[in-house]
Amino acid sequence: MTSSSGVDNEISLDSPMPIFNESSTLKPIRVAGVVTTGTDHIDPSVLQAYLDDTIMKSITLGQLVKNADVLNKRLCQHHIALNAKQSFHFQGNTYISDEKETHDVVPLMEVVSQLDILPPKTFTAKTGTNFGNDNDAEAYLQFEKLIDKKYLKLPTRVNLEILRGTKIHSSFLFNSYSSLSPQSILNLKVFSQFYNWNTNKGLDIGQRGARLSLRYEPLFLHKLLHNPHSNESPTLFHEWFLETCWRSTKICSQGTSAPYMYSGTMLSQAGDQLRTILGHTFVLDKRDHIMCPTKGSMLKWSNELSPGKHLKTQLELNSVKSWMNDDFITFSTTIKTGYLKNLSSQQSLPVHICDKFQSGGPSDIRGFQTFGLGPRDLYDAVGGDAFVSYGLSVFSRLPWKKVEKSNFRLHWFFNGGKLVNHDNTSLGNCIGQLSKEHSTSTGIGLVLRHPMARFELNFTLPITAHENDLIRKGFQFGLGLAFL
């Protein structure tokens, strides 16, 4: 990392458009140096690795902007910076030619990058409350500590969270994030959780265990995904994980209620078991926002293997497009599907209800209660082995000038889907079951796009439903990060 003087021009990455056109993005450049501020907490060799993998590889002006955006994003994701900004200083041209001088001399613009980093807080402690769907409420206490570079060279952050709520009896979570390289993060979780699994009467689930995951985001693919003329910030990553825990399942106490009121399926879930999961997740997200996108597309594919117990796969696709000024009208389509196969040598031994798919709810198929679709035993939702769900949504800014710039949106939706137990029949038969007799709903409402979460208040109207489905006609409130 070096500094330089004699600066002729300067431009901030926050407003790059004035210097960009079709030809300027191809202009040859050389990064002559990087001037940094706020980097005392970072080991120099670690920061140099991030620079070498991003902006130092740039050979054109367009590549420099792409790589600078990747660098800023990566520093924040890896807990190295709370915020990062860059500006470029242009020092005029030098000239290069090949040794045999068979080609014309090429002007090469020299650039010095000014990287300003807002260091993350070394220690934070906070307490608060969370509110969610179905009258969920939680109180939490959280501590977070940044490990000093003199103790551990790799950027590492540890987190401790203690939580208690209406459905979570108690929760203890220890999180450790270590940046192995500019492209990968190692995450270790140690947890102890006791919570109520939401059914008609419910199960009390206790889990004690650990989860080790490695997230890998190949930087070289950003050259293909990123467009310097737009505000898109594409994400592509693989995540591999190993999770093992001891799971205890108990039937909830219902006071004087007789035990026989529980279904046989629910009673069969009681007991203890060792749960081990090997998993992989692939995500390609080209949307401009995670919770409330206005354009772009997303693909997410998840796979889980529990040796000797089950194999589970799930696919999600989302496409968003907007029209008119300031994205006045936004159209979103989403489809999800999943399949679970019982690998147990004893086919009569069922997959645990918590490992099965569930459908229905204010953030899933609207117009139905949470876990309101699919197979039931008496009054209990027992989950399914395969599902399909889809949603069409149209969002519009409020048609009044005083509030059209607000974060509120009018919302119309059409949702549908089906959840089945295929009993390890052929895939063809399973697809046949999923392709007909869907439960569907429609409705209108109001959406609030808050930076921390998305709020929905919809008036829902179920159109078609199965006999055992639990419908929700009328107003339905939704709160969350991801919606169908």
From Swiss-Prot:
Protein name (database record): Sorting assembly machinery 50 kDa subunit
Subcellular location: Mitochondrion outer membrane
Membrane-spanning parts: none
Membrane topology note: Multi-pass membrane protein
Taxonomy of the source species: Eukaryota, Fungi, Dikarya, Ascomycota, Saccharomycotina
InterPro entries documented for this protein: Bac_surfAg_D15
GO terms (BP aspect): protein import into mitochondrial matrix; protein insertion into mitochondrial outer membrane; protein-containing complex assembly
Species this chain originates from: Saccharomyces cerevisiae (strain ATCC 204508 / S288c) (Baker's yeast)
Subunit structure as annotated in this protein's UniProt entry: Component of the mitochondrial outer membrane sorting assembly machinery (SAM or TOB) complex, which at least consists of SAM35, SAM37 and SAM50. Associates with the mitochondrial contact site and cristae organizing system (MICOS) complex (also known as MINOS or MitOS complex).
